[in-house]
Protein backbone atom coordinates (compact mmCIF):
# COMPACT_ATOMS: atom_id res chain seq x y z
CA UNK A 1 0.00 0.00 0.00
CA UNK A 2 2.81 2.39 0.94
CA UNK A 3 4.57 1.57 -2.32
CA UNK A 4 1.40 2.32 -4.27
CA UNK A 5 0.93 5.62 -2.46
CA UNK A 6 4.55 6.58 -3.15
CA UNK A 7 4.16 5.77 -6.83
CA UNK A 8 0.93 7.76 -7.02
CA UNK A 9 2.53 10.73 -5.31
CA UNK A 10 5.55 10.51 -7.59
CA UNK A 11 3.34 10.40 -10.68
CA UNK A 12 1.37 13.40 -9.47
CA UNK A 13 4.58 15.31 -8.75
CA UNK A 14 5.95 14.43 -12.20
CA UNK A 15 2.75 15.59 -13.87
CA UNK A 16 2.89 18.85 -11.90
CA UNK A 17 6.52 19.43 -12.87
CA UNK A 18 5.84 18.64 -16.53
CA UNK A 19 2.81 20.93 -16.54
CA UNK A 20 4.93 23.65 -15.00
CA UNK A 21 7.64 23.14 -17.61
CA UNK A 22 5.07 23.26 -20.40
CA UNK A 23 3.56 26.43 -18.99
CA UNK A 24 7.00 28.00 -18.68
CA UNK A 25 7.85 27.05 -22.27
CA UNK A 26 4.57 28.56 -23.50
CA UNK A 27 5.23 31.77 -21.58
CA UNK A 28 8.81 31.86 -22.88
CA UNK A 29 7.67 31.35 -26.48
CA UNK A 30 4.96 33.97 -26.02
CA UNK A 31 7.53 36.46 -24.73
CA UNK A 32 9.83 35.63 -27.67
CA UNK A 33 6.97 36.22 -30.14
CA UNK A 34 6.29 39.57 -28.48
CA UNK A 35 9.98 40.47 -28.71
CA UNK A 36 10.13 39.45 -32.38
CA UNK A 37 7.09 41.57 -33.27
CA UNK A 38 8.21 44.56 -31.21
CA UNK A 39 11.45 44.61 -33.20
CA UNK A 40 9.32 45.40 -36.27
CA UNK A 41 7.72 48.54 -34.82
CA UNK A 42 10.20 51.20 -35.97
CA UNK A 43 10.31 49.84 -39.52
CA UNK A 44 6.51 49.77 -39.54
CA UNK A 45 6.40 53.36 -38.25
CA UNK A 46 8.70 54.35 -41.11
CA UNK A 47 6.57 52.68 -43.77
CA UNK A 48 3.26 54.00 -42.45
CA UNK A 49 4.15 57.45 -41.18
CA UNK A 50 7.26 58.85 -42.86
CA UNK A 51 7.41 61.10 -45.88
CA UNK A 52 10.68 59.41 -46.80
CA UNK A 53 8.98 56.07 -47.46
CA UNK A 54 6.38 57.74 -49.65
CA UNK A 55 9.11 59.66 -51.51
CA UNK A 56 11.02 56.46 -52.28
CA UNK A 57 7.86 54.80 -53.60
CA UNK A 58 7.11 57.74 -55.89
CA UNK A 59 10.76 57.81 -56.96
CA UNK A 60 10.64 54.12 -57.89
CA UNK A 61 7.50 54.51 -59.97
CA UNK A 62 8.74 57.70 -61.64
CA UNK A 63 11.86 55.78 -62.69
CA UNK A 64 9.70 52.86 -63.81
CA UNK A 65 7.65 55.10 -66.10
CA UNK A 66 10.78 56.55 -67.73
CA UNK A 67 12.27 53.07 -68.14
CA UNK A 68 9.05 51.74 -69.67
CA UNK A 69 8.85 54.61 -72.15
CA UNK A 70 12.44 54.01 -73.29
CA UNK A 71 12.24 50.21 -73.46
CA UNK A 72 12.28 48.62 -76.91
CA UNK A 73 11.08 45.14 -77.78
CA UNK A 74 11.96 42.80 -80.61
CA UNK A 75 9.80 42.90 -83.72
CA UNK A 76 6.61 40.96 -83.23
CA UNK A 77 6.86 41.01 -79.44
CA UNK A 78 4.43 42.69 -77.04
CA UNK A 79 5.67 44.90 -74.20
CA UNK A 80 5.16 43.53 -70.68
CA UNK A 81 5.88 44.62 -67.13
CA UNK A 82 5.85 42.05 -64.34
CA UNK A 83 5.05 43.35 -60.91
CA UNK A 84 4.91 41.81 -57.49
CA UNK A 85 1.92 42.88 -55.41
CA UNK A 86 2.56 42.88 -51.67
CA UNK A 87 4.53 45.95 -50.59
CA UNK A 88 5.09 46.64 -54.30
CA UNK A 89 1.65 47.66 -55.51
CA UNK A 90 -0.40 46.79 -52.43
CA UNK A 91 0.33 48.14 -48.95
CA UNK A 92 -0.44 45.54 -46.28
CA UNK A 93 1.05 47.44 -43.36
CA UNK A 94 -2.23 47.33 -41.37
CA UNK A 95 -1.82 43.54 -41.26
CA UNK A 96 1.71 44.04 -39.91
CA UNK A 97 0.24 46.46 -37.37
CA UNK A 98 -2.23 43.78 -36.27
CA UNK A 99 0.69 41.37 -35.84
CA UNK A 100 2.51 43.87 -33.62
CA UNK A 101 -0.51 44.66 -31.47
CA UNK A 102 -1.33 40.97 -30.98
CA UNK A 103 2.26 39.60 -30.84
CA UNK A 104 1.44 37.32 -33.76
CA UNK A 105 4.05 35.76 -36.05
CA UNK A 106 3.11 35.38 -39.69
CA UNK A 107 0.45 32.72 -40.18
CA UNK A 108 -1.00 31.69 -43.53
CA UNK A 109 -4.57 31.45 -42.23
CA UNK A 110 -4.41 34.91 -40.68
CA UNK A 111 -2.96 36.27 -43.93
CA UNK A 112 -5.83 34.78 -45.94
CA UNK A 113 -8.28 36.40 -43.52
CA UNK A 114 -6.53 39.73 -44.19
CA UNK A 115 -6.83 39.24 -47.96
CA UNK A 116 -10.50 38.31 -47.55
CA UNK A 117 -11.06 41.49 -45.53
CA UNK A 118 -10.23 43.47 -48.70
CA UNK A 119 -8.55 46.33 -46.83
CA UNK A 120 -5.21 46.62 -48.64
CA UNK A 121 -4.03 50.09 -49.59
CA UNK A 122 -2.22 51.17 -52.74
CA UNK A 123 1.52 51.85 -52.57
CA UNK A 124 2.12 55.50 -53.57
CA UNK A 125 2.51 55.78 -57.35
CA UNK A 126 1.45 52.20 -58.08
CA UNK A 127 -2.03 52.85 -59.48
CA UNK A 128 -0.81 55.64 -61.74
CA UNK A 129 2.08 53.57 -63.11
CA UNK A 130 -0.07 50.48 -63.61
CA UNK A 131 -2.72 52.41 -65.50
CA UNK A 132 -0.13 54.28 -67.57
CA UNK A 133 1.48 51.05 -68.80
CA UNK A 134 -1.87 49.42 -69.59
CA UNK A 135 -2.94 52.45 -71.64
CA UNK A 136 0.36 52.91 -73.52
CA UNK A 137 0.80 49.70 -75.51
CA UNK A 138 1.99 47.67 -72.55
CA UNK A 139 0.57 45.06 -70.21
CA UNK A 140 1.17 44.64 -66.48
CA UNK A 141 1.20 41.07 -65.19
CA UNK A 142 0.95 40.47 -61.46
CA UNK A 143 3.34 37.73 -60.36
CA UNK A 144 2.63 37.30 -56.68
CA UNK A 145 2.93 34.66 -54.00
CA UNK A 146 -0.60 35.19 -52.83
CA UNK A 147 -2.31 31.80 -53.11
CA UNK A 148 -4.08 31.05 -56.35
CA UNK A 149 -6.56 28.73 -54.63
CA UNK A 150 -7.83 30.98 -51.84
CA UNK A 151 -6.66 34.57 -52.32
CA UNK A 152 -7.36 35.49 -55.95
CA UNK A 153 -10.87 36.95 -55.63
CA UNK A 154 -10.02 39.12 -52.62
CA UNK A 155 -6.95 40.43 -54.42
CA UNK A 156 -8.81 41.32 -57.62
CA UNK A 157 -11.63 42.98 -55.69
CA UNK A 158 -9.17 45.09 -53.70
CA UNK A 159 -7.29 46.21 -56.80
CA UNK A 160 -10.50 47.20 -58.60
CA UNK A 161 -11.59 49.16 -55.52
CA UNK A 162 -8.22 50.96 -55.43
CA UNK A 163 -8.48 52.03 -59.08
CA UNK A 164 -6.09 49.61 -60.83
CA UNK A 165 -7.19 48.89 -64.38
CA UNK A 166 -6.35 45.80 -66.44
CA UNK A 167 -6.92 43.47 -63.50
CA UNK A 168 -8.69 40.72 -65.38
CA UNK A 169 -8.00 37.22 -64.06
CA UNK A 170 -5.62 36.36 -66.93
CA UNK A 171 -3.21 39.09 -65.73
CA UNK A 172 -2.59 37.29 -62.43
CA UNK A 173 0.07 34.66 -61.84
CA UNK A 174 -0.46 33.65 -58.23
CA UNK A 175 1.33 30.93 -56.32
CA UNK A 176 0.17 27.40 -57.05
CA UNK A 177 3.05 25.36 -55.66
CA UNK A 178 6.46 27.06 -55.72
CA UNK A 179 7.31 30.55 -54.46
CA UNK A 180 10.16 31.05 -56.95
CA UNK A 181 8.92 33.11 -59.90
CA UNK A 182 11.10 32.41 -62.95
CA UNK A 183 8.77 29.70 -64.29
CA UNK A 184 5.86 32.14 -64.21
CA UNK A 185 7.93 34.75 -66.03
CA UNK A 186 8.56 32.15 -68.74
CA UNK A 187 4.81 31.49 -69.06
CA UNK A 188 4.24 35.17 -69.81
CA UNK A 189 7.01 35.22 -72.41
CA UNK A 190 5.49 32.17 -74.15
CA UNK A 191 2.45 34.32 -74.92
CA UNK A 192 4.55 36.56 -77.16
CA UNK A 193 5.48 39.15 -74.56
CA UNK A 194 8.90 40.58 -73.88
CA UNK A 195 9.36 41.58 -70.26
CA UNK A 196 10.95 45.02 -70.20
CA UNK A 197 10.59 45.76 -66.48
CA UNK A 198 10.51 43.81 -63.23
CA UNK A 199 8.97 45.68 -60.29
CA UNK A 200 9.25 44.38 -56.73
CA UNK A 201 10.27 44.86 -53.12
CA UNK A 202 12.38 41.69 -52.97
CA UNK A 203 15.33 40.53 -55.07
CA UNK A 204 13.36 37.31 -55.60
CA UNK A 205 10.90 39.36 -57.68
CA UNK A 206 13.59 39.65 -60.36
CA UNK A 207 14.25 35.92 -60.89
CA UNK A 208 15.52 32.84 -59.08
CA UNK A 209 19.24 33.67 -58.97
CA UNK A 210 19.35 34.44 -55.25
CA UNK A 211 16.14 32.73 -54.17
CA UNK A 212 16.75 31.19 -50.73
CA UNK A 213 20.34 32.45 -50.64
CA UNK A 214 22.16 34.18 -47.78
CA UNK A 215 22.52 37.94 -47.78
CA UNK A 216 26.16 37.84 -48.87
CA UNK A 217 24.98 36.27 -52.14
CA UNK A 218 22.10 38.70 -52.39
CA UNK A 219 24.39 41.71 -51.96
CA UNK A 220 26.76 40.28 -54.57
CA UNK A 221 23.85 39.96 -57.03
CA UNK A 222 23.03 43.63 -56.51
CA UNK A 223 26.64 44.67 -57.13
CA UNK A 224 26.84 42.53 -60.26
CA UNK A 225 23.61 44.03 -61.63
CA UNK A 226 23.94 47.60 -60.39
CA UNK A 227 23.41 49.01 -63.89
CA UNK A 228 19.96 47.38 -64.15
CA UNK A 229 18.43 49.01 -61.10
CA UNK A 230 16.18 51.88 -62.13
CA UNK A 231 16.19 50.57 -65.71
CA UNK A 232 15.16 46.90 -65.79
CA UNK A 233 14.78 46.23 -62.07
CA UNK A 234 12.62 48.65 -60.07
CA UNK A 235 12.95 48.19 -56.31
CA UNK A 236 10.36 49.36 -53.78
CA UNK A 237 11.35 49.83 -50.11
CA UNK A 238 10.19 47.28 -47.54
CA UNK A 239 11.69 47.35 -44.05
CA UNK A 240 9.19 44.84 -42.66
CA UNK A 241 9.92 41.49 -44.32
CA UNK A 242 11.41 39.83 -47.38
CA UNK A 243 13.98 37.39 -48.69
CA UNK A 244 16.63 39.41 -46.87
CA UNK A 245 15.24 38.23 -43.52
CA UNK A 246 15.68 34.59 -44.47
CA UNK A 247 19.14 35.56 -45.69
CA UNK A 248 20.27 36.53 -42.19
CA UNK A 249 21.28 32.95 -41.34
CA UNK A 250 21.26 29.45 -42.78
CA UNK A 251 17.87 27.84 -42.13
CA UNK A 252 16.49 31.04 -40.60
CA UNK A 253 12.82 30.24 -41.15
CA UNK A 254 13.27 26.75 -39.69
CA UNK A 255 14.54 28.20 -36.41
CA UNK A 256 12.25 28.74 -33.44
CA UNK A 257 11.46 32.27 -32.35
CA UNK A 258 14.44 32.46 -29.99
CA UNK A 259 16.71 31.27 -32.79
CA UNK A 260 15.41 33.95 -35.14
CA UNK A 261 15.97 36.65 -32.52
CA UNK A 262 19.54 35.41 -32.04
CA UNK A 263 20.15 35.40 -35.82
CA UNK A 264 18.95 39.00 -36.03
CA UNK A 265 21.22 40.11 -33.21
CA UNK A 266 24.20 38.14 -34.55
CA UNK A 267 23.86 39.95 -37.90
CA UNK A 268 24.18 43.40 -36.32
CA UNK A 269 27.45 45.18 -37.15
CA UNK A 270 28.39 47.35 -34.18
CA UNK A 271 30.98 49.90 -33.17
CA UNK A 272 33.10 48.70 -30.24
CA UNK A 273 32.87 52.06 -28.52
CA UNK A 274 36.59 52.80 -28.72
Curated annotation (Swiss-Prot):
Record's bilayer topology term: Lipid-anchor
Lipid-bearing positions (N-palmitoyl cysteine): 21
Residues with lipid group (S-diacylglycerol cysteine): 21
Keyword terms, alphabetized: Cell outer membrane, Lipoprotein, Membrane, Palmitate, Signal
Top-rank taxon, per record: Bacteria
Keyword Transferase set for record: no
Entries under Pfam families matching the protein: Acid_phosphat_B
InterPro entries per the UniProt record, alphabetical: Acid_phosphat_B-like (IPR005519), HAD-like_sf (IPR036412), HAD_sf (IPR023214), Lipo_e_P4 (IPR006423)
Leader sequence segment: 1-20
GO cellular component: cell outer membrane
Localization: Cell outer membrane
NCBIfam families: lipo_e_P4
PANTHER family reported for this sequence: ACID PHOSPHATASE-LIKE PROTEIN (PTHR31284:SF10)
Protein's name in the database: Lipoprotein E
Record organism: Haemophilus influenzae (strain ATCC 51907 / DSM 11121 / KW20 / Rd)
Name of the coding gene: hel
